[in-house]
Amino acid sequence: MTRLADATWPEIAALAASGAVLVVPVGATEQHGPHLPITTDIDIAVAVVEAAGAHDPLLVTAPAVAFGSSGEHDGFAGTLSIGQEATEALLVELGRSACATFACVVFACSHGGNAAPLRRALDRLSSENRPVFGWWPRWDGDLHAGRTETSVMLAIAPERVRMEEAAPGDIRPIDELLTLLRSGGVRSVSANGILGDPTGASADEGRTLLDAAAADLVDAVARFRLQQQSTGRQSTGRQSTGKRDGVRT
């Protein structure tokens, strides 16, 4: 695994010439209940990308995008949102810049609120024939700061999880919550900011989820490379999106 932040520009040029793929973790800075840190989405995105890089030496991890579209978490202290338009513009410009060096650029997104601006950014970059695609974890389960995210955080940073503060939030299915979330945000349905129940989370479950996501990312990159080779041109577009990529908050 290579971190872009640790490399010099000549080293990066050599990596790009060897066919390396740049993977950009895309997270958010937002509340994750009383038990998880506000950088949870960043931490998870970076962990998945670095785990994937351990299996593919040609994956280069970029510094994470730390801010995104988190307006649904307004009203909770610590949430720092730049909105959808700014997120889209940021990703477009990052994609353009990264494609000047790398033959393939992947945006690995762990925050559902970024899904719409990322899709629009990918559409824009694709229309410019830039070799980019987006990826989301294929995780089912609860929506925000619940069992899934808590388990992954217990696997990657247990010292930062306050399990003594973990409690169920709104556990209704997404079909019952979506209209309320769109109109009033998370605060309108969950006083503690949780959508789901984190109390059953475990590090073992988190490691299983992390390993599966990393393997899926490696596979998605391999398929994209193959597509580029088979078409003989720069393939672009959205790839490997989970069922809840536009819903998880």
Tell me what each language-model feature is:
Residues 1-106, 110-233, 238, 242-249:
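Extended, histidine- and acidic-residue-enriched regions that form the cofactor-binding/catalytic faces
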